[in-house]
C-alpha cells in the first residue's frame, strides 16, 4: 500500500515512518522525495483545519493515501499565542531559533513571568485517494522554561517541558519523545484508521489475484 507523509521535515518523517512500520508493509514516501512540490498556504485557525488543508491537497496531487499533521503551541498568559502563528511567530521566513527567541522575549514582558504554563494541540489526518478524511487529536500540557535546553527535536522543543518530565522535548531521547509527545499521541489515536485502510488494501489485492 502506497502512503505519503505530507511533510518535508526530517524529524516528522522519521517519526511517522516508525509508526507506519509497526502496522504493516507500506510503500512509504514523503515530500522530501519531491523538493519541487509546493504545499498549500496554511490559512486555518486550528491544527485540524491546517492538517486537512495539507492532507487533502497532497492526496489529490499524488492520488494516494496521505498522512498530514499540524500542531500549535498555546500559552494562556500570552492570550493563546503563538497559536496559529506557531510556525511564523517572528516572521514567515524566520528560523525556529528566531521564533524561540521572540517567545522568550514575550514571556519576559508578562505581568506575572512565573506563569509559564503552555500546551501543544495537534491534529493528524489520514486522507484517502478519493478525499475521505480520518482525523485524530491530542494535546500535551507543560511549561515554558527560562532558556533553551537540549539540542534534539525542532521548533519549540528546547523551550517546552512536558508535565511529569524534568527535561524539555529537546533533552528527551528521540525514542522517548516519540512515545509521549502530542504528535505521538495523535498518531496512536489514528492507528485504527490506518490499520483499516491497510486491511482493505490487502483484501482488495487478494480478491484481484
Curated annotation (Swiss-Prot):
Pyrophosphatase that catalyzes the hydrolysis of nucleoside triphosphates to their monophosphate derivatives, with a high preference for the non-canonical purine nucleotides XTP (xanthosine triphosphate), dITP (deoxyinosine triphosphate) and ITP. Seems to function as a house-cleaning enzyme that removes non-canonical purine nucleotides from the nucleotide pool, thus preventing their incorporation into DNA/RNA and avoiding chromosomal lesions. The keyword Metal-binding applies. The active site is at residue 70. Its EC number is 3.6.1.66. This is dITP/XTP pyrophosphatase. The keyword Protein biosynthesis does not apply. InterPro entries: dITP/XTP_pyrophosphatase, ITPase-like_fam, RdgB/HAM1. Mg(2+) binds at residue 70. GO terms for molecular function: dITP diphosphatase activity; ITP diphosphatase activity; metal ion binding; nucleotide binding; ribonucleoside triphosphate phosphatase activity; XTP diphosphatase activity. PANTHER family: INOSINE TRIPHOSPHATE PYROPHOSPHATASE (PTHR11067:SF9), INOSINE TRIPHOSPHATE PYROPHOSPHATASE/HAM1 PROTEIN (PTHR11067). The lineage of its organism: Bacteria, Pseudomonadati, Chlamydiota, Chlamydiia, Chlamydiales. Binds 1 Mg(2+) ion per subunit. It holds the Pfam family Ham1p_like. It is an enzyme of class 3 (hydrolase). One of its GO terms (biological process) is purine nucleoside triphosphate catabolic process.
Amino acid at each position: 500500500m502506497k502512503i505519503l507523509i505530507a511533510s518535508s521535515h526530517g524529524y516528522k518523517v522519521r517519526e511517522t515512518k516508525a509508526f507506519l512500520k509497526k502496522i504493516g508493509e507500506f510503500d512509504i514516501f514523503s515530500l522530501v522525495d519531491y523538493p519541487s512540490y509546493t504545499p498549500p498556504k496554511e490559512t486555518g485557525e486550528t491544527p485540524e483545519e491546517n492538517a486537512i488543508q495539507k492532507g487533502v491537497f497532497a492526496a489529490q496531487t499524488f492520488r494516494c493515501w496521505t498522512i498530514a499533521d499540524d500542531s500549535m503551541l498555546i500559552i494562556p498568559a500570552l492570550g493563546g499565542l503563538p497559536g496559529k502563528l506557531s510556525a511564523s511567530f517572528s516572521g514567515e521566513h524566520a528560523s525556529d531559533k528566531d521564533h524561540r527567541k521572540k517567545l522568550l522575549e514575550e514571556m519576559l514582558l508578562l505581568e506575572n513571568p512565573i506563569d509559564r504554563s503552555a500546551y501543544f494541540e495537534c491534529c493528524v489526518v489520514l486522507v484517502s485517494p478519493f478525499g475521505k478524511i480520518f482525523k485524530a487529536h491530542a494535546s500535551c500540557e507543560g511549561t515554558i522554561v527560562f532558556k533553551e535546553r537540549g539540542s534534539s527535536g525542532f521548533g519549540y522543543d528546547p523551550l517546552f517541558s512536558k508535565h511529569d518530565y524534568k527535561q524539555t522535548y529537546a533533552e528527551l531521547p528521540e525514542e522517548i519523545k516519540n512515545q509521549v509527545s502530542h504528535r505521538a499521541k495523535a498518531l496512536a489515536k489514528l492507528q485504527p484508521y490506518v490499520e483499516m485502510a491497510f486491511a482493505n488494501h490487502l483484501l482488495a489485492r487478494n480478491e484481484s489475484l
